[in-house]
Amino acid sequence: MQVYLVGGAVRDQLLGIDSYDNDWVVVGATPEMMLAQGYTAVGKDFPVFLHPKNKEEHALARTERKSGSGYTGFDCFFDPSVTLEEDLIRRDLTINAMAMDDSGQLYDPYGGQADLNNRILRHVSDAFVEDPLRVLRVARFSAKLASLGFTVAKETMQLMRDIADSGELNTLTPERVWQEWHKSLSTPRPDVFLSVLRDCGALAVVLPEIEALFGVPQPEKWHPEIDTGIHTLMVAEQAAKLSTSLPVRFAAQVHDLGKGVTPESEWPSHKMHCHTGLKLIKKLCERVRVPNEFKELALMVCEQHSNIHRAAELKPQTIIKILNKFDVWRKSERLKDILICCQADHAGRKGLEDLPYPQAGIFMLAYQAAASVDVQAIIQDGFKGPAIRDEQEKRRIEAVKVALNK
């Protein structure tokens, strides 16, 4: 039997970037041989084993044949006679279809290294169209590698359009959609994930709420880019520059969903979008099973980002009311995340990317002043029961007045 390092680990090694997961393929072995050498069987649908020492996954070389619809409709065949080339051809992209043996010898039967050097994401074979999940995977790899100059090959993009047109994307479970979206949020360019999905027609199928933003105008005075969809991509890019927090990056992408349902008669104004967006975010998060941590931050950003942009105009009591809604007294780190989203929204406008965002400083100063109010001093002053909270509110408002010179 021969063991090869395969897939992303080989790709990343050749690119000179860190790889955290090693995947191995074993040629010429049977399950019995693996078990005899101390490996532990873990695969349900096909034979995957954990190494006895490092616990890394080792899969027996296999072939796949389409037998039904969707990304699960495959029959797998594994046997000691399956070659490395036969195993690699079933993979999605040429850059993921390379292998390396323990001596460092590279095996590249499908031109992955050439595509790596030319910064091309290209399908290995026409069997690419048999798995609709690959559309999302290619979009994610585009986001992961965009900063290195990678683009999708024209022929591959056409196959992705064919998949989108076929209806096969509807077979993807909500969990798989979220899994790929979630992974894309940790890439250097999460916005590219969305733009590639849109280019092939998949965004309208898997994330129609975001697709609905494209072609919707905003006031040119505030948004030189005009198109809400383009603005959303710009905000997504800015959020990734400002924060590594995945909930922050998610909230930035969905904060303006309400603009997608503004009646055309009201364009380019979107006076109610902070309100109408809440329902859309809730439905989206429910549909694709988004964790509560992501949903809660997105809802707060959606509801209050326009108010935060007007920080200099707000009365101290209004600022305290907003801080209360954020529950910052118990979750102080939340305010920073919300303000980063608002800063990304502010910077995600054509030609205005480098403008300062003093609103964040105003809110942080107000919070620090209000948080300094000592509840023990209120109690010592003789306040009891509900009166303690009322007095605390008054003193917080007064502290903000002093801090902001209002």
Curated annotation (Swiss-Prot):
Domain (HD): residue spans on this chain: 228-329
Any Gene Ontology biological process: RNA repair
Catalyzed reaction equations: a tRNA precursor + 2 CTP + ATP = a tRNA with a 3' CCA end + 3 diphosphate; a tRNA with a 3' CCA end + 2 CTP + ATP = a tRNA with a 3' CCACCA end + 3 diphosphate
Entry keywords, A to Z: ATP-binding, Hydrolase, Magnesium, Metal-binding, Multifunctional enzyme, Nickel, Nucleotide-binding, Nucleotidyltransferase, RNA repair, RNA-binding, Transferase, tRNA processing
PROSITE patterns: HD (PS51831)
UniProt xrefs under InterPro entries: CCA_bact, HD/PDEase_dom, HD_domain, NT_sf, PolA_pol_head_dom, PolyA_RNA-bd, tRNA_CCA-adding_enzyme
One MF annotation (Gene Ontology) recorded for this entry: phosphatase activity
Subunit architecture: Monomer. Can also form homodimers and oligomers.
Family: Belongs to the tRNA nucleotidyltransferase/poly(A) polymerase family. Bacterial CCA-adding enzyme type 1 subfamily.
The protein's role, per its UniProt record: Catalyzes the addition and repair of the essential 3'-terminal CCA sequence in tRNAs without using a nucleic acid template. Adds these three nucleotides in the order of C, C, and A to the tRNA nucleotide-73, using CTP and ATP as substrates and producing inorganic pyrophosphate. tRNA 3'-terminal CCA addition is required both for tRNA processing and repair. Also involved in tRNA surveillance by mediating tandem CCA addition to generate a CCACCA at the 3' terminus of unstable tRNAs. While stable tRNAs receive only 3'-terminal CCA, unstable tRNAs are marked with CCACCA and rapidly degraded.
Recorded domain comment: Comprises two domains: an N-terminal domain containing the nucleotidyltransferase activity and a C-terminal HD domain associated with both phosphodiesterase and phosphatase activities.
Protein name: Multifunctional CCA protein
